[in-house]
């Protein structure tokens, strides 16, 4: 019995230190497709270096409002990067994310902004 218990304990410890394969889904708006293709590759390499875990990021792109509706209707997004705070607010109003999402990260949870030039 002791050998079995010791073997099981070693197996549990070994499993906990093995690298993990992580799958994430980023639900985003159309113009960010190429940006996130590049960013995801860089992030995956960084994550692997820091943790030893492999992370694969799938992307879903469409109009910002349509993507918000997809999340509201149940698409299992791990990350939401939409064009308008209004769209993210709609997700929060339906209880899919915390209503205080904008205060969660620096810069009102907006890692970048864009400027329109005429």
Language model segments and positions:
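N-terminal signal peptide c-region/cleavage motif recognized by signal peptidases
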Residues: 14-16
């Amino acid at each position: 019995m002791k050998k079995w218990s010791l073997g099981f304990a070693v197996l549990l410890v070994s499993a906990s230190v093995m690298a993990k394969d992580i799958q994430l889904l980023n639900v985003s708006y159309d113009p960010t497709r190429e940006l996130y293709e590049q960013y995801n590759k860089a992030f995956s390499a960084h994550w692997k270096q820091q943790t030893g875990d492999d992370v694969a990021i799938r992307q879903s792109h469409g109009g910002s409002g349509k993507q918000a509706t997809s999340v509201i209707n149940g698409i299992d997004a791990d990350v939401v990067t939409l064009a308008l705070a209004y769209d993210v607010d709609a997700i929060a109003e339906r209880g899919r994310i915390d209503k205080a999402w904008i205060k969660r990260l620096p810069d009102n949870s907006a890692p970048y902004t864009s400027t329109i030039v005429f």
